[in-house]
Amino acid sequence: MLKEKTLTWFGVPFIKFPHDLIFYQKIIFETKPDLIIETGTKHGGTTLFLAHMLDLVSNGRIITIELNPGRKLKFYHPRITQFIG
């Protein structure tokens, strides 16, 4: 079993199996979504990964929702909007 902070994307921890990211990029490449809504930001690694995939297809933005006010994103990306609470 992997530890929670073992895997990172550009230095930001994410809690996913690495093969999940392959499926995410495939879906994003094929659909070029205008909007991705993510619930549960935690550290933001998956959020940042999704933003980078949207950069590659030149489309879309992400709204991420986190209930814990202590989990505000520690980075900025123009495609990401975070709501807390």
Give residue ranges: language-model regions.
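N-terminal, positively charged/glycine-rich alpha-helical extensions of SAM-dependent methyltransferases
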Residues: 1-4
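S-adenosylmethionine/decaboxylated-SAM
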Residues: 7-85
